[in-house]
Amino acid sequence: MEAWLYNLLQWLALPEHGLSTVFVIAFISATLLPMGSEPAVFGLVKLNPELFWPAILVATAGNTLGGMVSWWMGWGTHHAVNKWRDSSTHIRALAWLEKLGPKACLLSWLPGVGDPLCAVAGWLKLPFWPCTLYMAIGKFGRYLVMTASLLWIFPGQI
């Protein structure tokens, strides 16, 4: 599996793949695989400044679709995690998520907790489309702020 993923990433690193690479990397990084898509977005925009908005939108779409997959995975595992049901941490986290509802998916942009949050939202069977909307808003904001900040910190052409 590791060799396959490495070969895929090497192929996607080819410059002629541009926006499709950003989409695939953003999609994969929204699952529970440890991967960041921000460097791919920044690299593409740094090399092609005219692709700023297309890259942000494509990354948002890929990352949101990946979050939707995580939601469905969480929904499908609803019956598989009964053994953690009684822990106090689990009960507090579930109460917090149920209180916030789909709006909790605004936090899907957070590193480390955002992707599992999408899965837990599915596990809780929070409404799919509102969760998707809030995921998209959070992820769009992350890509916009992160890419604009990096371009501001590292100005000029390569």
Report residues per predicted region.
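Membrane-interfacial helix-loop-helix
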Residues: 1-23, 47-158
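Structural signal for alpha-helical transmembrane segments and their flanking helix-loop junctions
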Residues: 27, 31, 39-48, 123-125
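A broad, structure-centric signal for solvent-exposed, well-ordered loop/edge residues
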Residues: 34, 39-42, 117, 133
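Short helix-coil transition sites and intra-membrane helix breaks within transmembrane domains
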Residues: 28-38, 107-114
